[in-house]
Every structure is written in structure tokens, then in C-alpha cells.
Curated annotation (Swiss-Prot):
It holds the Pfam family AICARFT_IMPCHas. The IMP cyclohydrolase activity resides in the N-terminal region. Its EC number is 2.1.2.3, 3.5.4.10. InterPro entries: AICAR_Tfase_dup_dom_sf, Cytidine_deaminase-like, MGS-like_dom, MGS-like_dom_sf, PurH-like. The gene is purH. Keywords: Hydrolase, Multifunctional enzyme, Purine biosynthesis, Transferase. The keyword Hydrolase applies. The keyword Hydrolase applies. It comes from Rhizobium meliloti (strain 1021). One of its GO terms (cellular component) is cytosol. Disulfide bonds: none annotated. This is Bifunctional purine biosynthesis protein PurH. Residues 8-158 form the MGS-like domain. Belongs to the PurH family. PANTHER family: BIFUNCTIONAL PURINE BIOSYNTHESIS PROTEIN ATIC, BIFUNCTIONAL PURINE BIOSYNTHESIS PROTEIN PURH.
Amino acid sequence: MAVASKKIPAPDEVRIKTALLSVSDKTGIVELARALNDKGIRLISTGGTHKALADAGLPVSDVSELTGFPEIMDGRVKTLHPGVHGGLLAIRDDAEHADAMSAHGITAIDLAVINLYPFEEVRAKGGDYPTTVENIDIGGPAMIRASAKNHAYVTIVTDPADYSPLLEEIADGATRYAFRQKMAAKAYARTAAYDATISNWFAEVLDTPMPRHRVLGGLLREEMRYGENPHQKAGFYVTGEKRPGVATAALLQGKQLSYNNINDTDAAFELVAEFLPEKAPACAIIKHANPCGVATAPSLAEAYRRALACDSTSAFGGIIALNQELDAETAEEIVKLFTEVIIAPSVSDDAKAVIARKPNLRLLAAGGLPDPRTPGLTAKTVAGGVLVQTRDNGMVEDLELKVVTKRAPTAQELEDMKFAFKVAKHVKSNAIVYAKDGQTAGIGAGQMSRVDSARIAAIKAEEAAKAMGLAEPLTRGSAVASEAFLPFADGLLSAIAAGATAVIQPGGSMRDEEVIAAANEHDVAMVFTGMRHFRH
């Protein structure tokens, strides 16, 4: 049953006479308190905040003076008291509330400056279970929510970034309703995000990826100029997950990344991370979240050249992801072509100097590579809901490949198969990828018909061969990967016509036997992975 409101009109201006300050992040708190004190505002504080203000020589009362009760249980209980919450929640123009305050000696609190225990930080650093639990704030969120609910009379500030706007607002000693309402909205968003982080942490600890209530929280890193298109508004929210990538990378040069830059850079870096840096240098070039070319080689510069060769036309204005430190030789190759973003685990000083010749080129150092096997979640909004799933962390190296044809693949074909399947995992469905000797030969993406994807990939391979001055297409003697099963033999026959000699696919079609028979008829080796990689 809903609680009835007395509907007492909120005043516009509220004079600030008493302020409660209780913060974990003490950035700027002494300066703020000094400014409040200069305005004759009474300061009340708790624990470490009280000590910081007292040490700064400021006149500050301990919260126990409001409660008549000492801080107990290692600080777990200090503000959970009617003396505090009555002062925050009282409707000042309600006679009954005013009488209750008078009867119980409750002081009205006009301003609350509160931030929370660093749960997100402790969780991100991998704190042990008891330490992480101990950093779940109880009193802080309670005071924030109480203050925000009573924003008709109380101003709540939860972010040090709002200290300056607060001081501007109270230049005449009062806050206006519009300001208090805005701060209340920010406060509820803060506690919601805080609780979301706690809830999601417990879901991880208990291995419950799909709990009854799933809250997706994040902190606005930046408002973007626009979204996918200029008429769409956009913002970049970060979750606090420390997975190396575009959200955690350092921008070494270049202007702000756009919405599309971030989306494409994430896709590129997740793809190139499939290739272990200790095994071989690798490069992936991405446009519109699809790979144009991917390659490994003895050197990073050669890997870039081989990736570029697959589709140099589409690579123009693309995103380049590397699995090793960007060196000067590779940088010299990259600056020959217009590129939007480069992301690598690190960047050498010599490479920075080279890239600096292209000041608009965005250069990111991620500090490492994401582990493709790490569990996580992805989300997609739909009308009226959110689709949530675990990250596709399936790895072809972990699968038991099943040879289903008379001819088994050669050792080289098997390597090419695995390479192609890794790439196909990151191509929009329907996906077909030809690969040979650690290089994509042709990529067909996003077609409604799988056979059309095979044909497009073959056309790309022919165009690449012509550009390279080769007599035959790159698909000759290649392996071909399909991210989902081949429903008919036509897709296989198209790949065979392009020159593929080996096929890797999940299998599982009602017509598997028909497809296997076609492969045997053309002496093509085929393996089933048993794992699909749809990508939409």
C-alpha cells in the first residue's frame, strides 16, 4: 500500500545553518568545510572526517553530540540514530514534525556532504572476501537516501566535483529548490550504482550470472558529441571492471574517441587478444566492428602489412589493434594510411614520436591484453527489457575437434582452421573466413545467406590478390571457417570453388551428412568444433 503524502509545498530557498560532513574520499573536504565555516554554518562530522577537520583547526562537532551515543563496533554504528535521521527527514513546515524535533532535541540538518566507503575500488583490486564485505557502507547510503528524499529542505552532495557548484549556489547563504532537486537525483543515482556493484559482486562470488534482479551500473566517463549518428545523444559509462581495453586504456594522443570509435576499438582489441603475444605478433584491422584483415607474422610490422593486404580498401579509416607493444617500424607502416585509432598493450617512445606526426590519430595504451577466457557479461537493450548473456569466452584451443571426413587435415591446414575460426568468432553472422599461413585471405560478414558470405569473402580474396600482383586468389589452398553450422552443401561448394581445401564449422545441421559427403567428394578435410559463435 502506497504511503500518503501530506503535500506540504516545498520552499524555494532554504538557508544553510547546519551541515553534516561524512566522507571516505576526503578530496577537497577541508577547503569546503572552511568555506562553510566562514559563512557561519555549524559543522558536524564523523570519525575520520571529524579528525581531518579538527586537525585543520576548524570548529567541528562530533555526531555523537547529536545522538548522545558514542560510535561503536569499529565504526559500524555511528549515524544510524533518530538524532541524525530525524534531522535529515523532518518536514520543517509540518507542525507534527516540528513538535517531534523539539520534544526529542533533534537538530535540523540543512546540508549533507557524504560519500561512501570505496567498495568499488576494493572489489576492482581483488580484495579478499572479508575486506570487500567490510567496505560495504551502511550508514552513508542511509543518510544519502534520507537527505535526497527530503530535498525539499535538505541539500545532499555526494561528489567532490560538486563542491564548487555548491559554494556558488550558497553565495547568499541559501540553496534553491532546483539545485536541491538536481543534487537529490545525483545522490540516488550514486547509491543505485553503489548497490548495483555490490549486487553484481555477490552474483560473481556465488557464480549466479542470472540473478532474480540484475542491475547494470556505471559511472559516466564522458558525454559524447553524439552516438552512432549525429542526431543521437550518447555517453560512455564505465563499470569499474579492470579488463584491459578501451575503457581502461590511456589515451596517449588524439582527440576524444567517438561512440563508433569506442565500439570498434573494443571489437578490435578483443579479437587480437585471441592470439597470444608470446606465440607470435598479431594485428587486427576493424571497420564497423567487423575485421577487414587479421594476421600473425614473425614481426609486428609484417603482421600489420599482412592484415592490411587482405582488404586495404576497407582498412582506410579503420581501427588497428595489436597484441604486442607498438614499435617504431610498425608505426611507420601505419602512418602511411589514414587510421582512426590504434590500440596496443603498450607503445614504445620511438613509436610515440612517429605517431605524433599524425596528431589526429588516436593512440591508446591498454596496459595489457584482455584474457579471452575470462567470464563476464554482455547486455543489449530491447523494447521493454534487457538481454543479458555471459561473454562468449569459448576458445578453439579448448575444444575437442572432430574430424568428420575421410581425409584428415594436414598440420598446416589444422593451424589455418584454428586461425580462421578464431577470427570468425568476431565476425558478424553469417560469417565466413578464409585463412592461410596465419593470414585472413577473405572475410564475408553479416549476410542473411551463408553462401552469400562465402561468395563475398571469395571476391575480397580475388581483389586482394590482384592488388598484391598475385596470379591466383589468396583462397587457393586455404582453410575456411564458418561461425555456425553449414545448413546446406552450397556454402561448402562455394568455398571449394574458391580454392579452400579444409573446412572448420560447429556442425549440428540436419544435413550434416550431405555436407560431409560433398566434402569427401572433393577430397576436402572437415572438422566439427561443437561450438557456435553467432554474433549479432
